[in-house]
Amino acid sequence: MNNGRIVRINGPLVVADNMKNAQMYEVVEVGEPRLIGEITRIEGDRAFIQVYEDTSGIKPNEPVYRTGAPLSIELGPGLIGKIFDGLQRPLDSIKELTKSPFIARGIKVPSVDRKTKWHFIPKVKKGDKIEGGDIIGIVNETPLVEHRILVPPYVHGTLKEIVAEGDYTVEDPIAVVDMNGDEVPIKLMQRWPVRIPRPFKEKLEPTEPLLTGTRVLDTIFPIAKGGTAAIPGPFGSGKTVTLQSLAKWSAAKIVIYVGCGERGNEMTDELRQFPSLKDPWTGRPLLERTILVANTSNMPVAAREASIYVGITMAEYFRDQGYDTLLVADSTSRWAEALRDLGGRMEEMPAEEGFPSYLPSRLAEYYERAGRVKTVGKPERFGSVTVASAVSPPGGDFTEPVTSQTLRFVKVFWPLDVSLAQARHYPAINWLQGFSAYVDLVANWWNTNVDPKWREMRDMMVRTLIREDELRQIVRLVGPESLAEKDKLVLETARLIKEAFLKQNAYDDIDAFSSPQKQARVMRLIYLFNTHASRLVERGIPTKKIVDSMGQLLPEIIRSKAAIKNDELNKYDELERKLISVFENLEKEAGT
């Protein structure tokens, strides 16, 4: 394989000649430091290479070493709880090797530790017919995750050898498959190219909600397992805190958090918090189900693209094991900016706002890899990849290309409103602009498993919030006194919905995570208030009298979200009794 020679360097873009027979997206090592790069364009024997490390100091005429392989990552036991850079290099291993807090250029460390021994329990026997995706054994990687060892997708045949139960490293052959006369060894670890989606049997309709513990996300704009969501918002509106809440409390088996081009201190917050936090679904430390990819804004721009693909490939790998995985990417705008930067350096024709014309297709490829699937291989199993990505539009302009193109491909839109954030309403998700295409699909799950009136209660809340917005303009002009009594009740109910349900404190021990049952109990209180109060208003009782009769009950309902724990829901029975008692007294008065 012939090596190339550098002819031009322009930031992260390097042009090399003598690259005959090179392949698109082939990984190369650039210059004397052997910096990792990827071929993104070929013209004759010239290759345009995007380099994933700082190119300072390399010179024309230095060699470019070809590898003949695409950008691939290692998949196997040892991924959970790790912190990787954008190229899947473990940061702790780099620190041990270099004795420095900085990532040295050209450093090569294995993604999966070669020395650790894992206890392998075989699940197949010699002579079995196997195919790609079959589970041949398990490794208990953490108390939360049983790592299922899969046959690589391209391998099929007869199992010639399988090791006995015992401790093995990721490089030890644990099985040998006779594939058309060739002996193919299988190890605990496999490699997969990041730009190629992993295969599956069929894509299924997502019908089960991915519970997040955040009330506005679970109830007003729910996301299903295998769904796609975007969180656009201007600086300071709470994107990162909302995504961190998703990563912490979601009911996913595996969470992969990709910090793509965001500030380093945000990743530092994650790394400090996660070891001490407990998973509310299992009670175990969160790090036992989490993988972090740290590719911060001060790291090379080109590596942002790699980090997104690395994250989604790891998510697909755990999906293939039959798990529900969540990929949180913060933020895809930084990836798009990297594409714009490289497109400009390659002198490509720019499209809207300087972004390359292929931006929509890249975003589509990324979101297309989400979904709930029936996996390949035996035994039959189902897994999902849910994708939630932040988008950072400059100045909060949702018409800019990244946000508008993202909207074409996602089914859930959680727009953050800076005016809500300034009013200290968090999460600052605008209930008028947002949408979810999964409401009809997940309503049956909520009605069956949580509360048979869930859909009815949710729709009442949404209708009330929309009507309140219509009334707000009238109130601004002539004041609330001029409204009809039923409209005054709409304003009061909307205030209760916002204060008791939509607002949520991500830093409060009790309020940070709301179980589905707790959410339904709060909704039920609001629904009861609205239903009974509407009847009384129709009978001529003023809204003000109804609210005054409540005394401290409405503030008590508002405080309940941070006062009543998820395992103390019987306390809501008392609030419900008090509420009904007040309305019974008012009805007696109205009847006389």
Curated annotation (Swiss-Prot):
Give the InterPro entries listed for this entry: AAA+_ATPase, ATP-synt_VA_C, ATP-synth_a_Xtn, ATP_synth_asu-like_sf, ATP_synth_asu_arc, ATPase_F1/V1/A1_a/bsu_N, ATPase_F1/V1/A1_a/bsu_N_sf, ATPase_F1/V1/A1_a/bsu_nucl-bd
Binding positions for ATP?
233-240
Q: Which reaction does it catalyse?
A: ATP + H2O + 4 H(+)(in) = ADP + phosphate + 5 H(+)(out)
Q: Where in the cell is it found?
A: Cell membrane
Q: Does the entry feature the keyword Nuclease, yes or no?
A: no
Gene Ontology BP annotations: proton motive force-driven plasma membrane ATP synthesis
Q: Which UniProt keywords apply?
A: ATP synthesis, ATP-binding, Cell membrane, Hydrogen ion transport, Ion transport, Membrane, Nucleotide-binding, Translocase, Transport
**GO CC terms in record:** plasma membrane; proton-transporting two-sector ATPase complex, catalytic domain
- Topological type in the membrane: Peripheral membrane protein
A molecular function (GO) held by this record is:
ATP hydrolysis activity
Q: Which gene encodes it?
A: atpA
What is the protein's quaternary organization? Has multiple subunits with at least A(3), B(3), C, D, E, F, H, I and proteolipid K(x).
**Keyword Aminoacyl-tRNA synthetase (UniProt):** no
Q: Which Enzyme Commission number(s) are on file for it? A: 7.1.2.2
Q: Native species of this protein? A: Saccharolobus islandicus (strain M.14.25 / Kamchatka #1) (Sulfolobus islandicus)
Q: What does this protein do?
A: Component of the A-type ATP synthase that produces ATP from ADP in the presence of a proton gradient across the membrane. The A chain is the catalytic subunit.
A Pfam family it matches: ATP-synt_ab
The family assignment reads: Belongs to the ATPase alpha/beta chains family.
The protein in question is named A-type ATP synthase subunit A
Reading the lineage from the top rank, the first entry is: Archaea
Gene3D superfamilies the record matches: 2.40.30.20, 2.40.50.100, Bovine Mitochondrial F1-atpase, Atp Synthase Beta Chain, Chain D, domain 3, P-loop containing nucleotide triphosphate hydrolases
